[in-house]
């Protein structure tokens, strides 16, 4: 069975709160409100944010944005001792780790399923989720390295291209949109920007499946609502990675 269609998108763009800083007061913690703590430019937080949007939980899960450059002390002391984003405050508990949160949101809240019933697709999903860190490492390493795009990054992108051809019932990793796409798209979004802006390299050239994936995922409102300005992401990352 294919994953269900996304919850109907509101015609109005969600008004997002400003990021909280070291001088900001905390929200009324553990008052029964479910809160997703994010940083707007963080790809890991973006995963959980997309899942929340896709399942139509904008009224059930409140976004709380944290300024990672000027974090409020109460976030580590009272919310999430790991002091990272994303985290989810739900049922008087706080949970973290982005892929775990995507699965948790899918399991514990109503809305369209993020994983199909098909056992072959479920197995492939786990293989792809296990590969995310290696894909990200290969890509970021190449961005930082001097010279042309390294062989490891090319191989990683080619692996994604091949993975996107496994199921022919749609343009996404499992055919239809799923948690696997949610795991990868924040990073594919960034690598397209970074490889172009830093290495003058088009990640979609010679990769028609990846090109189609990017085109189709940008038609999904739950994702596009979470996108940040490409130039900001490029400059922010160049500064963070020490790239002139």
Curated annotation (Swiss-Prot):
Residues 118-241 form the GST C-terminal domain. InterPro entries: Glutathione-S-Trfase_C-like, Glutathione-S-Trfase_C_sf, Glutathione_S-Trfase, Glutathione_S-Trfase_N, GSTL1/2/3, Thioredoxin-like_sf. Pfam families: GST_C_2 (PF13410), GST_N_3 (PF13417). CDD domains: GST_C_Lambda (cd03203). GO terms for molecular function: glutathione transferase activity. Residues 1-27 are annotated as: Disordered. Induction: Up-regulated in the leaf sheaths of rice plants grown from seeds that were inoculated with the nonpathogenic P.fluorescens strain KH-1. Residues 32-113 form the GST N-terminal domain. Glutathione binds at residues 85, 97-98. Belongs to the GST superfamily. HSP26 family. This is Protein IN2-1 homolog B. It comes from Oryza sativa subsp. indica (Rice). The gene is GSTZ5.
């Amino acid at each position: 069975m294919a994953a269900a269609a996304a919850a109907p998108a509101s015609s109005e763009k969600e008004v997002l709160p400003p990021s909280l800083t070291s001088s900001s007061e905390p929200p009324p913690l553990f008052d029964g409100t479910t809160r997703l703590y994010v940083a707007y430019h963080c790809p890991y937080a973006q995963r959980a944010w997309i899942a929340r949007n896709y399942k139509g939980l904008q009224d059930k899960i409140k976004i709380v944005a944290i300024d990672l450059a000027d974090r409020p002390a109460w976030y580590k002391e009272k919310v999430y001792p790991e002091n990272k984003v994303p985290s989810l405050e739900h049922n008087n508990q706080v949970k973290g780790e982005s892929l775990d949160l995507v699965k948790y949101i899918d399991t514990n809240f109503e809305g369209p399923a993020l994983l199909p019933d098909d056992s072959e697709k479920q197995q492939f999903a786990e293989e792809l989720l296990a590969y995310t860190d290696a894909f990200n490492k290969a890509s970021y390493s190449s961005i930082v390295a001097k010279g042309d795009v390294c062989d490891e990054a090319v191989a990683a992108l080619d692996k994604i291209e091949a993975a996107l051809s496994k199921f022919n019932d749609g343009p996404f990793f499992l055919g239809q949109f799923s948690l696997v796409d949610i795991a990868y798209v924040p990073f594919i979004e960034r690598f397209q920007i970074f490889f172009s802006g830093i290495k003058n390299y088009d990640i979609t050239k010679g990769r028609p499946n990846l090109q189609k994936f990017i085109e189709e995922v940008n038609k999904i409102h739950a994702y596009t609502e979470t996108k940040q300005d490409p130039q900001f992401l490029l400059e922010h990352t160049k500064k963070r990675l020490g790239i002139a």
